[in-house]
Structures are given as structure tokens and as C-alpha cells.
């Protein structure tokens, strides 16, 4: 199991270090894990002048999975767009043909008070959002900023999906629904956008291959509202790139801390890029304050989806549950009566729990 470790920017190196400690425990206990580091994002720009350099490309392609910290930061905001850290993330997703983004939103019982919603609204919350990653308005051509025939500046982007792109993400979502509670909600804006009307048609066609799964449809504006009003009605949600980007961030905050939430981006063969759902948090970088649990749980997702190591994945997840039950909290999830720990302190607790 060769893993490319890309610490990235901001708090990335700190949180990745704790995930590596967890992998080291598993390696000591017999899992054949091999790791190698490379830069991505701002760190890569600082070193190579580009956010996704050739050395990183080579390692990412050769590895069986990629574990990433976070990319970005205000220091890079003035760079030309192709050189910005986020472009490195888009490029590696494209390069590795990662088309399915899985974002779980799980509320741990111990953190029920961390959510801004009433505990009874979010108790037992466990949603999986499946987001298509390589199509839609983020990648559609033409795009740009230009001067029109009236001599006025204008900007334009193109929302576009091919049938094969929608079909393959549909199969991923239905497959996940089959392993869970057999409920799938497809989110679109079919009343206004032809692209998502097309999306809905294909979802209905693919559903015929999964008669055990109950498929429902919801407009994106209503879905955003329902996630706050009654989130427990959802089990698996599937949607396009831009809607998924927004809804998965919204769902993450139902849980009280984005610092708790992992994510996976998979290709056709379950090779994946695994990263926490949060950003690089430059305001707390280097202070040993970050919450490493999302990154540790991303490593657990990697063990499950890319390596089929279900027992190892559960061992990591159970260790996280145990440290929360023991009352350990980083600053972002701290509440009175708990024990506040640093980033490395949380790593210590998880390793001890394993």
C-alpha cells in the first residue's frame, strides 16, 4: 500500500503529522504501508513555482492512494489564477480522474451541543453527500472574462455534463445507498437549468438498475433549506459539482465542527485522494491548535475505500469515538467540563486509544 502524503499549506503539515502517527501504529501491527511526501498547492509554488509540480504528479500517479492536508492561504491570493494553490487541487483531481467526492456528515453523540441546531434536530445525524467532481460549471468551456460587442466587460462560465459523467456518479451513489439505508436523494435545479433536467432524467434511468433503492428528487434551494430544517430525512444525497460544493459545506456545519469531517475523492477503480473537509486555516497555522480528527478519519476512509481494510478503518474510527467519549477536545469543539488538548495532544490520545 503506497501512500502519497501531501501536507500542503497552513495547518496541513500539523494535521497530516497526526494522521501519519495513526498509520504508523497500523504499520507496526503488520499493515504493509509505505509513505512518501511531496508538496502541493502553495508549498509547491514556493518550491517549484507551480502548484502541482512534476515530482508530485509522478508520485500521485504511482501511489495507490493520496492523503492530503489542506491547500491555500491569503499569501497566494494575488497570484495569477493558474498558479494559485487551489488550482493544484483541481489539477490533481483531474490528473487522477477523480470524479466521485464522498463527504460524510456525522454527528458524534458527544458533540451534540457543538451544533448550532437544537440537539434533537441533529441527534443521530449520518448523511453521505456524493458530489460529482470533474464536470459542471467549474470545468465547462467556454469560460472567461472578455469585452463584448458593446465594448462592455462581461464574464461567463458554462454549465455542462455529458451522459457518461452523470451515469458513473449515479452508479457510485446508488452503490453507496445499497450499503446504507437504501435511500437516495438526487439534488438538481431541473425547473430552471437544462443541465440538471438532463441529470434528473439519467438518475431516473439508472434507478431502474437498483429497484431496492428509493430515489427522490429535490431542488437545490429546497435541499439547502431542508438540511437545516430536518436533516435526518436524508441518508445519501447525490448532486453535481457546484451544488455539491455548497451543500457539503452546509451539511458539515450541522455537525458543529468542520474539523471533524473527512472526505474521499475516488476514480473508477477506488484509487482515491483523501483530505479533511476544512481548509488550511492560516490564522492558526503553526500554533498546534488545529483539530486533526478530520484528517485521521480521512485516513480511515482511505483504508476502507482504496485498500479494502475494513477492520483497520474501524479501529481508527473507534479510537476517535473513544477519545471523544473520554472528553478530549481541540479548541474548535471544546466545551466546559472537557479537557482541551492541542493538535499533537489529540494525536497522542488517538494513538493511545488504538
Swiss-Prot record:
Pathway(s) per entry: Amino-acid biosynthesis; L-leucine biosynthesis; L-leucine from 3-methyl-2-oxobutanoate: step 3/4
Name used for this protein in its record: 3-isopropylmalate dehydrogenase
GO MF entry, a single one: magnesium ion binding
Cofactor comment text: Binds 1 Mg(2+) or Mn(2+) ion per subunit.
Classification via PANTHER family: 3-ISOPROPYLMALATE DEHYDROGENASE (PTHR42979:SF1)
InterPro entries listed in its UniProt record: IsoCit/isopropylmalate_DH_CS, IsoPropMal-DH-like_dom, Isopropylmalate_DH
Keyword NADP part of the UniProt annotation: no
GO BP: any one term: L-leucine biosynthetic process
Listed cofactors: Mg(2+); Mn(2+)
Catalytic activity: (2R,3S)-3-isopropylmalate + NAD(+) = 4-methyl-2-oxopentanoate + CO2 + NADH
Subcellular location field: Cytoplasm
Positions that bind substrate: 93, 103, 131, 221
